[in-house]
Amino acid sequence: MKDGNIYPYRGKRSKAMIEDRLELNMENGIFIGLYLAEGNSHIKSGKVMICNNNTNILKIVEKWFNKRFIKNKTYVKKNENDYTSTTIQGYSVVLAKFLNKFVGSYSRNKFIPSEFYLAPIDFLIGLMDGYFSGDGTISKNSIEVSSASYELIEGISML
């Protein structure tokens, strides 16, 4: 055990090192933004999933997991229409619980916590970068995002 990290009270012990305080920096902002856009967490299984076909995004998420010694695996599925779906899964009950409580899970239940409104600019830049990389569209005349969560869209617009 290492000071400054959170460990599960029960269950398998792993090498994962989840910090007891989330530093509001660019790296964590990007991860949280990607999670808000493309992620989901399941507490019982301890899975934290981010679905995206962009290899650069998958590498960013894999690096974030690896830095914290979170076991992870990438899954690629092709359907009958030859559409590819890529998901990276990290395995940490502690992280799944944290994300569920801090920013929500499933598209319709996500939100921006009040702590983000006073966050450092680097974190907010990372958050927007991650979020727009997942759910955003930038065209010649507009910048758009979409979400099933009214609270998330409202929170993003207030940042």
Predicted regions and their residues:
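Intein-associated homing endonuclease modules of the LAGLIDADG/DOD-type, together
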Residues: 1-159
